[in-house]
Amino acid sequence: MTRPIIGIISNSYLLNDQYPVHAGGAMNSEAIAQVSGCIPLLVPSDPALVSVAELLDSCDGFLLTGGRPNVHPEEYGEVATEAYGDFDRARDAIALPLVRACVERGQPFFGVCRGFQEVNVAMGGSLYPEIRDLPGRMNHRMPPDGTMEEKFEIRHRVSVSEGGVFHKIFGATEVMTNTLHGQGIKEAGPRIVIDGLADDGTPEAIYVKDAPGFTASVQWHPEWNAAADLVSRPLFEAFGDAARAYQSGQARAARRIAS
């Protein structure tokens, strides 16, 4: 059997401020191929080009990546202001219904940064436009200057629930992570379980309650140094295992239909 196919949800950019592209960080593809053991497939996040139904039938799982544009606040009942930054409505139109469909089908996904926020919004939650403006919260944004190593350096602790999903993945109730986000969870969706918190109370790790498939998602960026990092590697390994289990189940179902 071939490796599972993981659809990597892309972002839309203007290359050199004029050439439109669908792009995804190389670190995402490397983590999926080298740590999850799956085939990375970059997906154009535009409903004019591909449908959610087609993606569900073409892929065994999905990586909901980070990105500069934010989920539009209209998706959670709030009015857009400058504080919410830039948006990517085409990605919203793919990612949000994709999350809901995966939850119902038991198809695995792994949300990272914006992807983590998409999972919450898709399941009925809302977001703060700027975490650092809240009383008692730290600045979770990446440094404006410096090398990649400096931007992705370990910066804070995340405490996860004892006996919970992330404790089982990490084998520990405290881990150290990077942080490169401005927005964060305000209200958790009705089925969203906040399983990990930063020391300032910011939600950092979630999953969907009673979902039949893998839904673990994180606010930090585990794709950085994924093969060597003791926190990142088990996340991508667990996601790969879930994708293989889903692929195997689909293959068994197809054989039953054909027999």
Task: Give residue ranges: language-model regions.
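N-terminal beta1-alpha1 cap of cysteine-dependent amidohydrolase-like domains
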Residues: 1-110, 120-128, 132-176, 182, ...
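Conserved G/P- and acidic residue-centered "switch" motifs that form tight phosphate/ATP-binding loops
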Residues: 113
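The feature captures the ABC ATPase H-loop/switch
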Residues: 116
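Active-site-proximal beta-strand elements of phosphoester/diester hydrolases
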Residues: 216-219
